[in-house]
Amino acid sequence: SDVYKRQIKSEQFIRDERNEFYNEFDKSFLKLFPHFITSFNNLLVEEARVYPKSDELLTTELRIFALIRLGVVDSNKIAHFLGYSLATIYNYRSRMRNKAAGDKDRFEQDVMNL
């Protein structure tokens, strides 16, 4: 039972650390690119636009594309950096690309130019 409690505490600690990391990443990124969310949303069809909840700075989608904006385009690296599976990153990337207002094949290039 003690081992189990330690395991749960450890998992909670990792979750808390990851959330703290996300928060610091988001704040730093938005300091560098204060108009990123608006500019990113302008690349999407209106009904697909992404808005963070009041308690978060960036959503998972926005965080993935923030990394792409910074030049991290390898899905493996993005998955490792954010602690998601490769399949999750592929799904997010393809879902957002399909919601592009303009040329879907240029979507990620357009993000890099924001």
Give a label for each model feature.
Residues 3-4:
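Short, small-residue-biased leader/transition segments that mark boundaries at the very start
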Residues 23-114:
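Cytosolic nucleotide-binding catalytic cores of signal-transduction proteins
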Residues 14-21:
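Signal-transducing coiled-coil linker helices
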